[in-house]
Amino acid sequence: MERLQGLLLWLLLSPSVVWASRGPLRPLCRPVNATLAAENEFCPVCITFTTSICAGYCPSMVRVLPAALPPVPQPVCTYRELRFASVRLPGCPPGVDPIVSFPVALSCRCGPCRLSSSDCGGPRTQPMTCDLPHLPGLLLF
């Protein structure tokens, strides 16, 4: 009987193992281009710019049966290596710093979410937009 249960378990799992080995249905964690908005409440315009961010699927596990154990931490797609770039907001009055710095993803990894450096929320239904009048283009340096 034990042998039969083992065979049944193998038959149930083997098609999913073969299917799963063909690759994930979602793109894995990697740098992707994204358009972001930069503004300062003291400057008259908002600008958008394109940078690399980390995005994609990270394999995770969820307990099927309720347990007294704490939940399994879910990994998120986050920076492995990054550099910082800056944009200059035009039209800022004297005494207001017109420079906005932002991270540029060079490589990514799946790991724990660090709220100090990442937005660990899920995908947004609305893109981040400007509250101020929008000035297209970018001034990177």
Curated annotation (Swiss-Prot):
SUPFAM superfamilies reported in the protein's UniProt record: Cystine-knot cytokines (SSF57501)
UniProt record similarity statement: Belongs to the glycoprotein hormones subunit beta family.
Phylogenetic placement of the source organism: Eukaryota, Metazoa, Chordata, Craniata, Vertebrata
Gene: Lhb
Function per UniProt: Promotes spermatogenesis and ovulation by stimulating the testes and ovaries to synthesize steroids.
Localization (cell): Secreted
Subunit structure: Heterodimer of a common alpha chain and a unique beta chain which confers biological specificity to thyrotropin, lutropin, follitropin and gonadotropin.
Transmembrane segments: none
Keywords (A to Z) from UniProt: Disulfide bond, Glycoprotein, Hormone, Secreted, Signal
Cellular component annotations (GO), alphabetically ordered: cytoplasm; extracellular space
Signal peptide: 1-20
GO-annotated biological processes: G protein-coupled receptor signaling pathway; luteinizing hormone signaling pathway involved in ovarian follicle development
Xref: Pfam families: Cys_knot
GO MF terms, alphabetically ordered: hormone activity
Protein name, entry field: Lutropin subunit beta
PROSITE patterns xrefs: GLYCO_HORMONE_BETA_1 (PS00261), GLYCO_HORMONE_BETA_2 (PS00689)
Classification via InterPro entries: Cystine-knot_cytokine (IPR029034), Glyco_hormone_CN (IPR006208), Gonadotropin_bsu (IPR001545), Gonadotropin_bsu_CS (IPR018245)
Residues annotated as glycosylated: N33
Gene3D superfamilies documented for this protein: Cystine-knot cytokines
